Each structure stands twice: as C-alpha cells, then as structure tokens.
Amino acid sequence: MNLRCRICGDEGEQARFEAREQMFGWGDRFPYFLCGRCGCLQIEQVPADLARFYGNGYYSYGSPAYRNALTAWLNGRRDAWAIEGRSAIGRWLHRRRPRQDLLSLRRLKPGPETRILDVGCGAGHFLYALRERGYTRLLGVDPFIDAEIRYPNGLVIERKDVAAVHGEWDVVTFHHSFEHIPDQQATLASAARLLAPGGVCVLRLPVVQSEAWRTYGVDWVQLDAPRHLYLHSVDSVRALAQQAGLTLEAVQHDSTGFQFWGSEQYRQGIPLRDPRSLAVNPASPLFSAEHRAGFERRAEAANAAQAGDQAAFYLRRV
C-alpha cells in the first residue's frame, strides 16, 4: 500500500506495522508505517480522540521544588556535573540519578545569561534545575498545563503553544515532547523563527534507528502507540531541519536501560503502569540486579555505536 510520508513526502511502497497501546494495557491497535526514503516511523492517521490515550498521570506535573536544603545541595552537585562537567561527587550522583536533559546542554557551553526556551515542558523540571544553578533568562511553555505557573525562584511556565511565543532565544529545547506533536513542520518552523543567529534547537527524541527497534519491533517500549506519532531517524530529522532552514550539526545518543527492560516487560504482556512494572515498583522482582546492570551496560554500548533508542539532535540556525 502506498502511503505519503508526512516528513519527506515520499509516496513509495512503505513497510506497515500494527502497534498496540501498551503503557496502560488498553490494547487498542494502530497502524504505523516506516518511510522507505527518510526512515521515519509514523502513525498512519492521528486519532481524533488522541487526548483520551494520555489518561490520568501520563505526564508528571508535580512541583520540581526541592524538598529540603540537603536535596537542593545534592541536586546542585549532580546538575553542575551534568551541565558543566564540574563536581566529582556530582558525577557519582549523576550515575545514580541521571539528568540526560541537563547533560544535553553541555556541548553548548551555556552561561547564566543564555536565553533558553523549553517547549512542552510540563511543570518545568528542566528549567527549574537551571534556575537553581543561576540561569535567569528562561521560559517554559506548554499548552496543556491548567494555568500559568510561577515559582518562588522566579521561573515562569506559560500556558501557550510555541507559535505564540515572541522574542529571540539562544537555545530552544524539546525534551521528549516533539514526537507527540501532529504538525512537525509548523512546530519546528516556529522554533526556528525564535532562534537568534547561530542559535540552536535541541530535539531530544526516541530514535527508530536503534537496537531496541530492531530487537523488539512493535514491542519497543518507546514506540508508545498512539501517543508517539513520529519515531524519527537521523535522515528524517535532517529533512525536517532543512525545511525549517536549520542545519543538523550533531547527534548525541542518550538512551538508558529502560529501552530493554521496558520492552522485555511488553513482550511478557506487562504494561508500563502495571503494579509489577519496574516503572511502578523499582523493587519489582521481574529483573535481578544483575539483569538491570546488564541492561544499562547494553544501553551504553548502543549509545557508543549510535544505536541507542533516543538521542539529542542539535539543529543550528546559520
């Protein structure tokens, strides 16, 4: 069957797949296809009732505020290592509780005056950590929060879409929000419009060119049908970037062991939100400590081979 790719426009014969909703275990089925030209795996038709598949608690809108002074200090050390490569104890803390979102900024060498816009930010956990590190020129936007959020530290999260944002920004980030957006071209064009000359858009996304997709197929946990409308490849992100007047400058794989244990659970018929799931009960006996450590080592190897199931894409305005 010939289907038109919504990323590159290819209308050739496309490989088709049927994916199930597996996070909540509802089992609804959705057809996807893999573009033969750009390699983007995409849902054939965006469900008219897409909102109902998010359910209660899909996103974490809880406050990112630190519970006490000790937590704030420990998180500060960890975050200093993630962003700036400083703090020996921070490196150790980061291995225990990683912040890949913050780590994605390191190659950009940001400073307190760097203007950073985060799109689809929820409660603003990413920006809150930056604000606590002394960054002041920050804004988060998300059209799905109930109302504007103002934190005591000065961070503001506005209830709006990126198309409604004004001003000029050095960095625009999408941390696992872009794959949920139906109109990919218009959204990236809006982000590109906001970038200062030489500015960078950082897209952190699931990647279909991955060991996890090759191994698990439609049981790959980050396929996440029907919420993930697009599972990109390097070529499909490059095509989108060119359409928006941006240049794909670098790709940094940052996948974790989740791609393996989550997919193994799906193969066993265990939804991500099931009481037996590691996502719900970290002490679950589903996988031994040895197995979990093996999943993390496997993820590190996949990242090194550019085959991890998620990555940060750096798109520069030139």
Language-model features: locations:
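Histidine-centered divalent metal-coordination motifs
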Residues: 176, 180, 228
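Conserved N-terminal segment of class I S-adenosyl-L-methionine
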Residues: 1-175, 184-188, 253-254, 282-287, ...
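Feature marks short, surface-exposed loop/turn motifs that line or immediately flank catalytic pockets
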Residues: 147, 208-211, 255-257
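Conserved catalytic loop of SAM-dependent methyltransferase domains
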Residues: 19-23, 249-283
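A short glycine-rich, Lys/Arg-flanked "PGG" loop and its adjoining helix->strand segment in the class I
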Residues: 185-200
